[in-house]
Amino acid sequence: MHVLTPSLYIYAFFIVCVRLKCGRSKRVANAKHATYDMPPKGLRVRDMLEKTAQQNCNQRKRGKCRKFFFLWKMDKMGDTHLGGQANGRKNLLRSESATDEASLGGNPLKEKLKESPANWGKDKQEEQQSTDRLPLPKVGNKMPEKKPDWFHVPAPTGKKYNELKADLKKLKLHTVCEEAQCPNIGECWNIGTATIMLLGDTCTRGCKFCSIKTSSKPLPPDANEPFNTAKAICEWDINYVVLTSVDRDDLPDGGASHFAKTIELIKFSRPEILIECLVSDFQGNVDSIRKLANSGMEVYAHNIETVRRLQKFVRDRRANYEQSLWVLKTAKEINPLLYTKTSIMLGLGETKQEVLQAMADVRQNNIDVITFGQYLRPTKNHLNVVEYVSPQMFDYYKEEGMKMGFKYIASGPLVRSSYKAGEYFMKNLVEQRRGVKLHAEG
């Protein structure tokens, strides 16, 4: 029996190590002259690019995307690393890919890969840039150098103006004429026209064009305001009155019941008086809209203020273009006897095409009356005036609007949504009624 000594153990360990080392050297030597069955190490970068491109693929049918990327990979790698079956497989995939592209109307991703990466998304960028190039109103931006001559108006004076101002102060009533710094206050008050502002003088919204005070928690409405308003209006020698208000999102119904009570008291004392109400959107509350529409008013007014593109730059975030149009449409559906009315400010960077599109949207929602006026910045803390629109352009919008079928349009640099509302509206209404009467007699 042989006994293994320590020296034999050492010798055996040495032999094993030598054989392992020789075997590894042989494999390395053979590998230098062998044909690779796998892609060389340099293709790892290509694989990374392929993976990135595949992640950016927007094709709905991902199976076809994978097929395309497999074809693309074979084209890049060549026949060397795919064996003798590469050519047949490539031709098959090419024919299938061509069929898929034909059924999809062409492969947009393949065309995109042919382009320089710098041009990827160029169409979308150009579309965005075309909108970005349009001017936008912004607080603090540079104003036009000089206000045109047609904006020069005399300071408010006159006996009627002073009497009306005293009555409003005595009854603790507010007017949008004063709060919004309307340039026509002297002219309107001297002919006995005023726009009474209900629900206080503090708004819960902060539109960037308006100078009315704002607060998230304004004072509660004055319970005596409907009575005082009705008393003042009945004492004035007027046949048309405009009631408006601040936005009161803090109230459950947005102040609709307060409006309705005021209208009821006015109509009780003077049923013949015509009432126009310029109201908020009530956050789309149908019950509030219904309450106002059935309150006895003749004209339901709500302003969209500007074109669709500029809404988020001009109005409070809680207001929007679609909701404003929907409110007017809904009021008309609830009470078809109502006249609906809206207003647009010009000079905020809108284009002619955008104004015409807004007019078409308004008319599509069966709105009867629209007014156009020039936006004037109340203070330096409000949006800048992008341009002063010429009187000729205001006339152009009026002509185009009448072609669209509006019942009446007031358009001019100094026109406001309530500016001479009774004069404009009554004149047009009387002319329409006269035309119907003459037609019936004929």
Swiss-Prot record:
Stored NCBIfam families: lipA, PRK05481.1, PRK12928.1
| Catalytic activity annotation | [[Fe-S] cluster scaffold protein carrying a second [4Fe-4S](2+) cluster] + N(6)-octanoyl-L-lysyl-[protein] + 2 oxidized [2Fe-2S]-[ferredoxin] + 2 S-adenosyl-L-methionine + 4 H(+) = [[Fe-S] cluster scaffold protein] + N(6)-[(R)-dihydrolipoyl]-L-lysyl-[protein] + 4 Fe(3+) + 2 hydrogen sulfide + 2 5'-deoxyadenosine + 2 L-methionine + 2 reduced [2Fe-2S]-[ferredoxin]
Q: What span is annotated as the signal peptide, if there is one?
A: 1-25
So which cofactors does this thing need? [4Fe-4S] cluster
Question: Does the record carry Secreted as a key word?
Answer: no
Tell me the route in metabolism or biology where this protein functions.
Protein modification; protein lipoylation via endogenous pathway; protein N(6)-(lipoyl)lysine from octanoyl-[acyl-carrier-protein]: step 2/2
CDD domains the record matches: Radical_SAM (cd01335)
Task: Domain (Radical SAM core): give its ranges.
Answer: 189-407
Q: Which GO terms describe its molecular function?
A: 4 iron, 4 sulfur cluster binding; lipoate synthase activity; metal ion binding
For this entry, the protein name equals Lipoyl synthase, apicoplast
Q: Which regions are flagged for Basic and acidic residues bias?
A: 109-127
Q: Where does [4Fe-4S] cluster 1 bind?
A: C177, C182, C188, S418
Q: What PANTHER family is this protein classified in?
A: LIPOYL SYNTHASE, LIPOYL SYNTHASE, MITOCHONDRIAL
- Entry's family note: Belongs to the radical SAM superfamily. Lipoyl synthase family.
Where is this gene product found? Plastid, Apicoplast
Q: Which keywords belong to this entry?
A: 4Fe-4S, Apicoplast, Iron, Iron-sulfur, Metal-binding, Plastid, S-adenosyl-L-methionine, Signal, Transferase
Cofactor binding comment, as recorded? Binds 2 [4Fe-4S] clusters per subunit. One cluster is coordinated with 3 cysteines and an exchangeable S-adenosyl-L-methionine.
- State which Enzyme Commission number(s) the record gives: 2.8.1.8
Q: Which InterPro entries does this entry report, sorted A to Z?
A: Aldolase_TIM, Elp3/MiaA/NifB-like_rSAM, LIAS_N, Lipoyl_synth, rSAM
Q: Which Gene3D superfamilies match?
A: Aldolase class I
